[in-house]
From Swiss-Prot:
Record's protein name: Dihydroxy-acid dehydratase
Residues binding Mg(2+): D81, D123, K124, E491
EC number: 4.2.1.9
Entry binding sites for [2Fe-2S] cluster: C122, C195
The protein's role, per its UniProt record: Functions in the biosynthesis of branched-chain amino acids. Catalyzes the dehydration of (2R,3R)-2,3-dihydroxy-3-methylpentanoate (2,3-dihydroxy-3-methylvalerate) into 2-oxo-3-methylpentanoate (2-oxo-3-methylvalerate) and of (2R)-2,3-dihydroxy-3-methylbutanoate (2,3-dihydroxyisovalerate) into 2-oxo-3-methylbutanoate (2-oxoisovalerate), the penultimate precursor to L-isoleucine and L-valine, respectively.
Cofactor binding summary note: Binds 1 [2Fe-2S] cluster per subunit. This cluster acts as a Lewis acid cofactor.
Pathway assigned in UniProt: Amino-acid biosynthesis; L-isoleucine biosynthesis; L-isoleucine from 2-oxobutanoate: step 3/4; Amino-acid biosynthesis; L-valine biosynthesis; L-valine from pyruvate: step 3/4
Length: 617
């Protein structure tokens, strides 16, 4: 009989009480011989990306039981960043990542679970589950709830695709009528699923697919499509298979740390750069690498950004394509296929199918596969009806988008840009680096300089933008919004979208030690490290200072003399306990957020907790 981890609680005379409790959950004598597989669900009625996951949990549970496992489901919390954004609720979003990861560890280890299937979707939940899987290192399979269909509105001569960001942009435009804004509001988010652009949720689900912890198609197959149900069933069968393979055959290749190794992280980051994904993914990959003891740092991302082309353009970088269009073009596997044709990937990395990347692409890249089922899956398209029911439609595109010259996904030779969609900048203003999403920036803005307008909070900056205090050429500096200084590293979607609504998004820059929503576009530079609260130079910027940004040379520079900089450091340190803290900011910080801030490191470390501040156990 195999020695499952769960035997700790299901075998032996001294575990009679535990077995009695297990029986009260429905387990039988036969079940005590099988692996206990956790369904780590994140169903929530607060989040459209999670509203349908209760039904998903039931499908997975039934399939696990059918194939010889004992399914046990529990839920994590889930915060909707879009609803939490623009007010104090956003302070809680990033800290929830650590809370979710910890809660998974608690449940899994307390009950000696053998393996887990992670049912996630939105911004902080997928990263948290990824971190937990690497921390626990038990067989794990990921399956997301799937992307939302893009919204649609009819104009005079055509139908236009829209998404959540359009609703925010138009909501900040005083020239738009209430009726028009209502029309956008009613159309922007038409179905269940993660928001339809390549925002943080979809970016992370695509990266998990590239890493190899989910099945092909997971990142782009729509939540509403009937094929998504098949994916859930396949994922359930897969977790049973790899669980038994590990415990019965001692196959350690199926463990998360062996699948998600440095080469896999590099492949995932290459995908991210190639498709211009959310800058938040960098934060989460760095945090996950720490959990898995993977030597993957900001410098690795910087090196990749110098050689990976931008070959896939998706909203918010364009209004032509959404994630449903990426799927039609072949999804994650097609993007990886194009990179592989240019020898930009490590082909020997393995996944939960037990295949290396080379074999996986041969089967799942639409430009090379002969598998009819794979081709059929990538034909899955949007139903076009408002619904929160998953698997409720079976629409298929008439043909796939295989256009490597002018299509959604292009070849290296026909790339949107030879420079990738994400870049790392360094300089005296960001000694440890900062991140910019170059996918949405016109090349003529790659070199930009202007006078600083400094704000101690996002709210203060928003007020300045809406009251007309920002003019073309300004560099807006929002500081003390980092992991520690916020605390919680708020997303700056509202400042950037309000700039867009008044047509200043291409004429101004915005830099911050906070972060940006996956929906952000324009010359927006975030994750400045060290952050202001950790004695970063951004804390010393003054109104009118010249700030120079050079994306070509990957630099960001506060243009003052070394002497002046040293004088400012001395002046700041002289403030004592008030040094490196925001002036006159009124913000209610709860005990929970203060506890998070106490341990939080800057963004270049993934905003993880500082081990040096923990007790030495």
């Amino acid at each position: 009989m195999p020695k499952y981890r769960s035997f700790t609680t299901t075998h032996g005379r001294n575990m009679s009480g535990a077995r009695s409790l297990w029986r009260a959950t429905g387990m039988t004598d036969e079940d005590f011989k099988k692996p206990i597989i956790a369904i780590v669900n994140s169903f929530s009625q607060f989040v459209p990306g999670h509203i349908h996951l209760q039904e998903v949990g039931k499908i997975i549970s039934k399939e696990i039981k059918k194939y010889g496992g004992v399914p046990k489901e529990f839920n994590t919390i889930a915060i909707d960043d879009g609803i939490a954004m623009g007010h104090s609720g956003m302070l809680y979003s990033l800290p929830s990542r650590e809370l979710i990861a910890d809660s998974i560890e608690y449940v899994i280890n307390a009950h000696c679970v053998d393996s887990m299937i992670c049912v996630s979707n939105c911004d902080k939940i997928t990263p948290a589950m990824f971190m937990a899987s690497l921390r626990l290192n038990i067989p794990s399979v990921f399956v997301s709830g799937g992307p939302m269909e893009a919204g649609k509105i009819k104009t005079k001569d055509k139908t236009k695709k829209i998404d959540l960001v359009d609703a925010i942009i138009h909501g900040g435009d005083s020239n738009k009528s209430d009726d028009f804004i209502r029309e956008i509001e009613l159309s922007a988010c038409p179905t269940c699923g993660s928001c339809s652009g390549m925002f943080t949720a979809n970016s992370m689900n695509c990266l998990i697919e590239a890493i190899g912890l989910s099945l092909p198609g997971n990142g782009t197959l729509l939540a509403t499509h009937i094929d998504r149900k098949k994916l859930f069933k396949k994922s359930a069968r897969n977790i049973v298979k790899i669980t038994k393979d590990y415990y019965l055959n001692n196959n350690k290749n199926v463990l998360p740390r062996n699948i998600a190794n440095k080469e896999s992280f590099e492949n995932a980051m290459a995908l991210d750069i190639a498709m211009g994904g959310s800058t938040n993914t960098i934060l989460h990959l760095l945090a996950a690498a720490y959990e898995g003891k993977v030597d993957f740092k900001m410098s690795d991302i910087n090196n990749l950004s110098k050689k990976i082309p931008h070959i896939c353009k998706v909203a918010p970088s364009t209004n032509l394509y959404h994630v449903e269009d990426v799927h039609r073009a072949g999804g994650v596997m097609r993007i990886l296929g194009e990179l592989n044709r240019s020898n930009l990937l490590n082909k020997k990395t393995e996944n939960i199918l037990g295949l290396n990347l080379e074999k996986t692409l041969k089967k799942y890249d639409i430009l090379s596969t002969k598998n009819k089922n794979v081709i059929k899956m990538f034909h899955a398209g949007p139903g076009g009806n408002r619904t929160i029911k998953p698997f409720s439609q079976n629409y298929r595109w008439n043909k796939l988008d295989k256009d490597r010259v002018n299509g959604c996904i292009r070849s290296h030779e026909n790339a949107y840009s030879k420079n990738g969609g994400l870049s790392v900048l360094y300089g005296n203003l960001a000694k440890n680096g900062c991140i910019i999403k170059t996918a949405s920036i016109d090349k003529k803005h790659y070199i930009f300089s202007g006078p600083a307008k400094v704000y101690e909070s996002q709210e203060e900056a928003v007020s300045a933008i809406l009251s007309g205090k920002i003019i073309a050429g300004d560099v807006i500096v929002i500081r003390y919004e980092g992991p520690k200084g916020g605390p919680g590293m708020q997303e700056m979607l509202y400042p950037t979208t309000y700039l867009k609504s008044i047509n200043l998004d291409k004429q101004c820059a915005l830099i911050t030690d906070g972060r940006f929503s996956g929906g952000t576009s324009g010359l927006s530079i975030g994750h400045i490290s060290p952050e202001a609260a950790n004695k970063g130079i951004i804390a010393l910027v003054e109104n009118g200072d010249d700030i120079q940004i050079n994306i070509v040379n990957k630099t960001i520079h506060l243009n003052i003399t070394e002497k002046e900089l040293n004088l400012r450091i001395i002046k700041e340190n002289a403030k004592g306990l008030k040094a490196y803290k925001p002036l006159n900011r009124k913000r209610n910080i709860s005990f929970a957020l203060r506890a998070y801030a106490h341990f939080a490191l800057s963004a270049d470390k993934g905003a993880i907790r500082n081990k040096k501040k923990l007790f030495n156990f």
